Amino acid sequence: MITRRSLATLAAGATLLPSIAQAQTWTPRRTETFTEGFPAPGRRPWADQVPQLRVGLLGGENEADRLGRFGAYRELLERTFGVPTRLFPASDYAGVLQAFSAKQIEIAALGASAYAGAWLDTNGGVEPLFVAEEADGSIHYLSVMVTRADSGITNMEQMRGKSLAWADANSASGYLIPRFSLRRAGIGVEPGQYFSRTGFGGGHEQAVVAVLQRQYDAAVTWTSGQGDEAQGFSRGNLTAMVQKGLLNMRDLRIIWRSEPILNGPMGTRTDLPAAFREDIKRFHLALPKAHPDIYKQIERGGGTGYREVRHQDFELFVELRREEAAARRRRS
């Protein structure tokens, strides 16, 4: 259980990653060592209980791009498991959380904070299946604060009195972790405390666009922090924007980076058959080697594949969500 003492330890400089490697009795499966091969096509016994597969897509980029990226993935799921498969793009992160609560979706790739929110909203009715690994095999990414390169802002001190866009209230990298980290550094995150104003950009892509269009002085978003910075790194929102022609990295400056954050999981409902959840795991563990183009599309870049996780790996984010909710109640 994450306690206030453990949060204090984190505030003293510990990483934002759980100690997955310390597990004594469980070895997570990884794509790199997964030898079972890609699942053979065919309708499964669990299909009587799961007659359709509904996949939630988090907000953060425009709907047409999301549907385009996941089109081949949807077709592969449908072909493999023999059940109609539909994509449900939400306008924001909250839409996916609400869909889980209403049992309107079976699976969704979530950020760590969004998973924690879904777990709280459903009273433990969702569980994580796996997370993406980065190019070096790690399972973390970074939150970064970006400004326009021509803004004259080169560090956090120069953000005093400037405006800041959060990405989404249910995003770890675009809200929860930067707020926690900035408060830890003695920087007030409420409007008028340090920044002249703060607001929500409407998603990661939209928040960066708002900076480029001078609607905000800075925004927070996510990146792997690995690979060629000129290309937006190896994976993340900046990578995707560069690939879509929406961003030239020369137009941005990164002025702040978080500590490593655990990658968000693929989440599913706990009331679904165990065989279904296992098949979804096996499908994804084998996907990067069997269908590398589809894997790179849905991950907005590449890595070494996927790794199994458990709920306990995300307990820190559950506690941070509770702390944030308590702080919000105190403000009101």
Placement of each model-derived feature along the sequence:
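N-terminal export signals
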Residues: 6-25
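Extracytoplasmic small-molecule ligand-binding "clamshell" domains
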Residues: 37-116
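Periplasmic-binding protein-like
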Residues: 58, 128-144, 201, 236-278, ...
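Bilobed "Venus flytrap"/periplasmic-binding protein-like clamshell domains
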Residues: 55-80, 113, 138-208, 213, ...
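Beta->alpha turn/N-cap motifs
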Residues: 54, 59, 91-93, 104-122, ...
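Pocket-lining segment of extracytoplasmic ligand-binding domains
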Residues: 165, 169-273
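An extracytoplasmic/periplasmic, membrane-proximal ligand-sensing/linker region
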Residues: 24-72, 268-332
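Acidic, polar ligand-binding/catalytic clefts
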Residues: 98-158
